[in-house]
UniProtKB/Swiss-Prot annotation:
The keyword Chaperone is assigned to this record: yes
Quaternary structure and interacting proteins, as annotated: Interacts with HscA and stimulates its ATPase activity. Interacts with IscU.
Organism: Buchnera aphidicola subsp. Acyrthosiphon pisum (strain Tuc7)
Alphabetized CDD domains for the sequence: DnaJ
Name of this protein: Co-chaperone protein HscB
Keyword Membrane: no
Entry keywords, A to Z: Chaperone
Length: 174
């Protein structure tokens, strides 16, 4: 059973997140392992597996990137996050300058104005990628979606690196 069916959602990329949450909690109430504590071991095992499936499905559909990769998989495209970045060299070369800006920030002790500027640039790129992914899914251009996901992964990664480096800097000055 696919996760869209499990949560009684239409099989499309853009989902009603409120409905997803409502259906998740309904399923949790119905299949929570604690409710079956007095049942047979085989029944408890089945319920536990169902509960794990419900939790995994919820986490997959709730997260934009995971939902995109799952939806691609449902449509016959096997996508692995680990290899996506390596396949988009032109993009990586084009945006390597963001890492240079990060290095400059570190050298300048994370100047607030420069930090805010870089954070805004990255966040705008993330939002743009997400909108492009939604649009390409609507047009069923799955190969384009895969390419944009690799770009989104890059921006998410540099956002995480920036946050990590800034936190290291803050610990050093305190």
């Amino acid at each position: 059973m696919n996760y869209f069916t499990l949560f009684d959602l239409p099989r499309k990329f853009n989902i009603d997140k409120k409905l997803l949450s409502q259906n998740f909690y309904k399923l949790q109430l119905k299949f929570h392992p604690d409710l079956f504590i007095n049942d047979s071991e085989s029944k408890k095992k089945i319920i536990l597996e169902k509960s794990i499936q419900i939790n995994k499905g919820y986490k997959t559909l709730k997260n934009f990137l995971n939902r995109a990769i799952y939806f691609l998989c449902l449509n016959g495209y096997e996508v692995k996050k680990e290899t996506l970045l390596l396949k988009n060299n032109d993009f990586l070369i084009r945006y390597f300058s963001l890492y240079e800006q990060l290095d400059n920030l570190k050298e300048n002790n994370f100047n607030k104005k420069e930090l805010n500027n870089l954070e805004q640039i990255i966040q705008k790129k993330i939002i743009y990628c997400k909108k492009k992914i939604e649009l390409e899914f609507e047009k069923t251009r799955y190969k384009k979606v895969i390419k944009i996901i690799s770009e989104l992964l890059f921006f998410e990664k540099i956002k995480d690196v920036l946050k990590k480096e800034y936190n290291i800097y803050l610990r050093q000055i305190n």
